[in-house]
UniProtKB/Swiss-Prot annotation:
Transmembrane segments: none annotated. GO terms for cellular component: cytosolic large ribosomal subunit. One of its GO terms (biological process) is translation. Belongs to the bacterial ribosomal protein bL35 family. GO terms for molecular function: structural constituent of ribosome. It comes from Polynucleobacter necessarius subsp. necessarius (strain STIR1). Disulfide bonds: none annotated. InterPro entries: Ribosomal_bL35 (IPR001706), Ribosomal_bL35-like (IPR021137), Ribosomal_bL35_sf (IPR037229). Residues 1-21 are annotated as: Disordered. This is Large ribosomal subunit protein bL35. Keywords: Ribonucleoprotein, Ribosomal protein. Residues 1-10 have a biased composition (Basic residues). Gene3D superfamilies: 4.10.410.60.
Length: 65
């Protein structure tokens, strides 16, 4: 059986941690930042975890992760 393909967009957006949780980047921090407060932008720094409801669908997009 041939190898399964991973979704390219999912490869760029998600990474699987050692414990099995999936890491994602924060949204709303690319542009239109002038109207956002410094506190708001500070809270958008770093990464976040994917919700439990979405883990199954993301794992199917990344078969070898």
């Amino acid at each position: 059986m041939p190898k399964m393909k991973s979704k390219s967009s999912a490869k760029m957006r998600f990474s699987v941690r050692a414990g099995g949780t999936i890491k994602r980047g924060q949204a709303f921090k690319r542009h239109i930042l002038t109207k956002k407060t410094t506190k708001n932008k500070r809270h958008l720094r770093g990464s976040a975890e994917v919700a439990k409801a979405d883990i199954k669908s993301i794992r199917s997009m990344l078969p070898y992760a």
